[in-house]
C-alpha cells in the first residue's frame, strides 16, 4: 500500500465527518523518536511478521511490554490482553491456542486500539536455473543452499 495515498484518503474520510487531520511526515530517526515519546495522535505504519506465529503480530504491536520499544504505536496497555498472550504462547496445544487467540481478537474488537487497513501481497520471481531457491512466505530472500544449474 502507498502510505501517502492512504493518509490522504483517511484525511478525506475524517474531514467528511468533521475531523480536521494534518498529515505530517518525518525522517525515520525523528519518526521513531516521536513514536517512542508518544508525540502522535495517530500513526499510519506497516508491520511485517518474520514468522508464522500469531504472537509475532499481537505482542510487538499491542502488548504493554512493547510500549518502551515504540512498536506498540497505540501505546495501549491492557493486562487481560497480555495475560491471554502469555497463555497462548505457553501452550503447545494448537486448538487451545486458537481459542485463546479468538479471545484476543474479541478483546481487540471491543477495545479497538488500532485499525488494520490493508495487507500487502509480496511477489517474488526467480530463474529456473537456480537450484534450491525457495519462496519464503514471510519475506526476505535466503541464498544459503542456492546454486546455479549448469
PLM feature spans:
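Short, solvent-exposed loop/beta-turn-alpha elements that line the ligand-binding surface or hinge
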Residues: 34-39, 59-90, 119-150
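Long, cytosolic, alpha-helical-rich C-terminal regions that act as interaction/scaffolding modules
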Residues: 55-56
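Short, conserved clusters of charged catalytic residues that mark active-site
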Residues: 26, 30, 83, 99-100
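Append "and occasionally in soluble cytosolic enzymes with long acidic Gly/Pro-rich linkers
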Residues: 1-12, 16-17, 77-79, 83-84, ...
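Ligand/substrate-recognition segments at binding pockets and active sites
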Residues: 1-51, 73, 94, 122
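Bilobed periplasmic-binding protein-like "clamshell/Venus-flytrap" ligand-binding domains
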Residues: 39, 43-47, 91-128
Amino acid at each position: 500500500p502507498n502510505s501517502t495515498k492512504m493518509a490522504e484518503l483517511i484525511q478525506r474520510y475524517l474531514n467528511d465527518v468533521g475531523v480536521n487531520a494534518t498529515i505530517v511526515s518525518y525522517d525515520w530517526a525523528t519518526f521513531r523518536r516521536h513514536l517512542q515519546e508518544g508525540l502522535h495522535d495517530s500513526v499510519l505504519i506497516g508491520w511485517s511478521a518474520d514468522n508464522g506465529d500469531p504472537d509475532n503480530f499481537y505482542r510487538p504491536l499491542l502488548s504493554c511490554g512493547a510500549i518502551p520499544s515504540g512498536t506498540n504505536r497505540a501505546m495501549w496497555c491492557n493486562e487481560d490482553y497480555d495475560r491471554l498472550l502469555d497463555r497462548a504462547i505457553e501452550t503447545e496445544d494448537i486448538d487451545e491456542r486458537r481459542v485463546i487467540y479468538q479471545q484476543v481478537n474479541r478483546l481487540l474488537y471491543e477495545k479497538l486500539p488500532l485499525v488494520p487497513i490493508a495487507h500487502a501481497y509480496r511477489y517474488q520471481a526467480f530463474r529456473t536455473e537456480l537450484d534450491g531457491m525457495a519462496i519464503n512466505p514471510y519475506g526476505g530472500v535466503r541464498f544459503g543452499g542456492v546454486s546455479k544449474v549448469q
